[in-house]
Amino acid sequence: FSAYGYTEPQESDIVYINDEMFKITGTEEEGLHICRYSDEEVNYDAFTTVYADTQVYTKASYERKNDILILEIGSNGGWENYRQLISQYDAMIQNSGCDYYIIVGDTDDPGTSIADTTQGIRNEDGTYIGVGDTAWEATLREAYGDHFINMRTYLIENGLTDVGLRPTVGDYKGFRRGRISKQLRYDWTHFNSYGYYSKGAIYAKGVELGYWE
C-alpha cells in the first residue's frame, strides 16, 4: 500500500542509535550485522557492536517522532492480557515524547480476533454486543478516555453511509451481533477500499481533540 505522496525508501533496514544512522545487514540464518550508514555511502566492513539495552530506533520512528501518533494494536500485537496491551501503548506514547495521540480500537468482529479469543457476540447477560463496548474496547476507553475511538462501532454505524452503500438484511443481523458489514471487508480481518476509506474518519477524532482544523 502506498499513500498519496509516499515514495518507497531507497534503503531498507535503516535504524538510528544515539542520533547516528546505521544499516542492518545479513540474515537470521547467516547472522545479522550492523554498520554505519549515510545517504552518500555505506561501509559494510565497519561492523558495530550493539550492547544490551541499547535503544535502537527504526528510521520511520526516529524521523516521525514528533508527529501525531495514531496507534492500533490488533491481532498481531503479541500481547497476552489487557495489562500488557496497555503497557505496550504506554511505552510507544512515552517513547515518542508526544502528547498528541489517537488510540484506534480493533476492527475484528467480536469472537474472531486471534489476539483476544475470550470475546464473543454476547454480553454476560446474554444480550448481543451490538454497538456496545467489548471488554477489550472498554479497557482502552478507560485507559485513554477521549483519545480512544471505537472504530468497530463507528464502522457499524457510519461505514456504509460514508461510502454510499446501503445495508442489507444480513448487515442488520450482523450489526446486532456487533459485526461490521461484509460490504466493507476484503476478508475476515482486512478491509476493502470502502472499509479503509471509511476508516479514514479517524481524522475527525483528531479534529475533536484539537489536532487538526
Cite the ranges covered by each PLM segment.
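Alpha-helical cap/lid subdomain in secreted, periplasmic
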Residues: 5-213
